Design a protein with these regions (language model features):
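Conserved active-site alpha-helix within GNAT-family acetyltransferase domains
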Residues: 62-80, 194, 206, 218-236, ...
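Conserved acetyl-CoA-binding loop-helix of GNAT-fold acetyltransferases
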Residues: 34-46, 180-183, 189-202, 227-228
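Conserved hydrophobic beta-strand within the GNAT/NAT acetyltransferase core sheet
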Residues: 56-60, 178, 212-216
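Active-site rim helix/loop that mediates acceptor-substrate recognition in acyltransferases
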Residues: 1-8, 127-154, 162, 168
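C-terminal "cap" of GNAT-fold acetyltransferases
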Residues: 81-103, 210, 215-220, 232, ...
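Short amphipathic alpha-helix that is part of the acyltransferase structural core
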Residues: 1, 95-131, 252-257
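Acyl-donor-binding surface of acyltransferase catalytic domains
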Residues: 32-101, 240-242
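Conserved donor-binding loop and adjoining core beta-sheet/short helix segment
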Residues: 1-48, 161-179
Length: 257
């Protein structure tokens, strides 16, 4: 599912593991000679399209790719940036009045682990950069320090969040990072997302963390909630461009008529 290649002309990484689940492929071009860029880009996006990707995300570290870039029948018309957001811990005792509990995920119960993954994957299906996580990967991430919580309303699991301690290798500063936060579609617009964020902040304060962080795309509507609650953009981590196979889209449209 993951292809890597590096030589004297280019260096790239392609993740096609999300095609079956989300219809997405992710291409990262780290280096490429300008004279070879379009040829390499076309080869990679065509390969992803042939393998079933309806939407192709490309991160270009070379600076060659811009909005409006055209390569045969692929045009790169939209983009989004991934940002690191930060906030100093400040616990707000105010809640939304929503009767929500945060329940630590019981990793010994395989059914609960699977249900957690299913909800997480469903929530992230439309999120920019969203990737599918298997039960096996979730358990590996937990073993490496990630803490996962189900947001429950009565007996119903209505959402989730996960967090992990992150250390800045350059400064030695420690952050408590929000790894994920999501709400089931049937329970959205009820203040549950905000409630989950406040619970994350409470958990950070209880464990003595002074700095909070998260990574979020500026095309993700949730970023407006985070900014309203005091999170600030500290650093832009990457820019991603999106494209589709317009030739395949036209073919599929004609065959539906």
């Amino acid at each position: 599912a993951v292809i890597r290649e590096e030589n004297e002309h280019w260096s790239y990484r392609v993740n096609q593991g999300e095609i079956e689940s989300f219809g997405k492929a992710y291409i990262q071009i780290y280096a490429c000679d300008e004279c070879d860029f379009e040829r390499l880009l076309l080869r990679l996006v065509k390969q992803a399209s042939r393998n079933g990707a309806a939407q192709i995300h490309v991160r270009d570290n070379t600076g060659h790719l811009k909005i409006g870039y055209q390569a045969e029948y692929f045009s790169f018309d939209t983009s989004y940036n991934q940002w690191k957001l930060v906030k100093t811990t400040k616990v707000d005792s105010k809640t939304n009045g929503v009767a929500i509990q945060a329940v630590s995920l019981d990793t010994s119960d395989s059914k609960l682990v699977e249900e957690y993954c299913n909800l997480e994957n469903e929530c992230f299906k439309q999120v920019p950069g969203g990737v599918k996580r298997t039960s096996k990967q979730l358990l590996l991430d937990i073993a490496e320090g990630e803490r996962c919580f189900s947001l429950c309303k009565g007996d119903a699991q209505v959402g989730f969040f996960s967090a992990k301690k992150i250390k800045n290798e350059e400064t030695g500063e420690e952050f408590f990072e929000l790894e994920s936060l999501g709400v089931s579609e049937a329970f959205r617009n009820q203040g549950i997302g905000k409630e989950g964020l406040l619970m994350f902040e409470q958990l950070a304060a209880e464990n003595g963390y002074e700095k909070l962080s998260m990574i979020c795309a500026d095309s993700n509507p949730a970023i407006y909630l985070y900014e309203r609650l005091g999170y600030q953009k500290e650093k832009m981590l990457s820019t991603w461009y999106t494209t589709r196979d317009k030739k395949r889209d036209l073919y599929e449209q004609e065959n539906k008529q």
